[in-house]
Curated annotation (Swiss-Prot):
Record-level Gene Ontology MF annotations: rRNA binding; structural constituent of ribosome
Gene Ontology cellular-component terms listed: cytosolic small ribosomal subunit
Name by which UniProt lists this protein: Small ribosomal subunit protein uS15
Originating organism: Elusimicrobium minutum (strain Pei191)
Xref: InterPro entries: Ribosomal_uS15, Ribosomal_uS15_bac-type, uS15_NS1_RNA-bd_sf
Length: 89
């Protein structure tokens, strides 16, 4: 699933450090989290979609790596992101 332009702008607006910030770890984690939420719902409706399941696993791993990096580099931003996205630490 591709997020619509408006959805992406809304998500980025919450986590951007500046107007031009589109690739910071916080923004990436927020966008990946939205894709994970969509795929989770899709897999509940389509349990035999193994390619989708693999994609979900890859996204979860990517988000985990980004969160680990963010935790090392900027712990305050990490706690803010995990709290706003309701992610476990």
């Amino acid at each position: 699933m591709v997020l619509s332009v408006n959805d992406r702008k809304e998500i980025m607006g919450k986590f951007q450090a500046s107007a031009a910030d589109t690739g910071s770890p916080a923004v990436q984690v927020a966008l990946i989290t939205e894709r994970i939420k969509y795929l989770s719902g899709h897999l509940k409706a389509n349990p035999k979609d193994f390619a989708g399941e693999r994609g979900l696993t890859k996204l979860v791993g990517q988000r985990k790596r980004l969160l680990s990096y963010l935790k090392k580099k900027d712990f305050a931003k990490y706690t803010q992101v995990t709290k706003e996205l309701n992610l476990r630490k």
